[in-house]
From Swiss-Prot:
Binds 1 Mg(2+) ion per subunit. May bind a second metal ion at a regulatory site, or after substrate binding. Monomer. GO terms for molecular function: magnesium ion binding; nucleic acid binding; RNA-DNA hybrid ribonuclease activity. Mg(2+) 1 binds at D14, E52, D74. PANTHER family: RIBONUCLEASE H1. This is Ribonuclease H. The keyword Aminoacyl-tRNA synthetase does not apply. Its EC number is 3.1.26.4. It comes from Nitrobacter winogradskyi (strain ATCC 25391 / DSM 10237 / CIP 104748 / NCIMB 11846 / Nb-255). Endonuclease that specifically degrades the RNA of RNA-DNA hybrids. It is found in: Cytoplasm. The gene is rnhA. The keyword Transcription does not apply.
Amino acid sequence: MNSPALPHVTIFTDGACSGNPGPGGWGAILRFGDIEKELKGGEPHTTNNRMELLAAISALEALKRPALVDLTTDSQYVRQGITAWIHGWKRNGWRTADRKPVKNVDLWQRLDAALQPHQVRWHWIKGHDGHSENERADQLAREGVAMAKLMRTV
């Protein structure tokens, strides 16, 4: 018996930080056929790498059923971490090759869990290079930074 084909979803993500650490934001664009959804958020005290990770996590967690996902990021940290480094980290009990604890382990574990229902192909593009969806994700991330700055003043 053949299983039905997975729906195809395209995701573009970005993270931003005002200071590193400092207030940060993330943005994601999800596209399924003609349907598009924008997501964004922020945290008052964070790092750029955490926001890059949270953009991918939030986008994947927003999917309601298993999908074939093409996820594009401008973060080598995220792409390399999830396609190359994570396997060794898991084997080493979430420690790096030199036995130090993995930074942002909470988010790496959350990303690992968010991937499980899906088939994800990871793509990297150069940031701020005129790629329209990356520019839009960056704008959403900057809006997330603005939201995070407001959170700090409350």
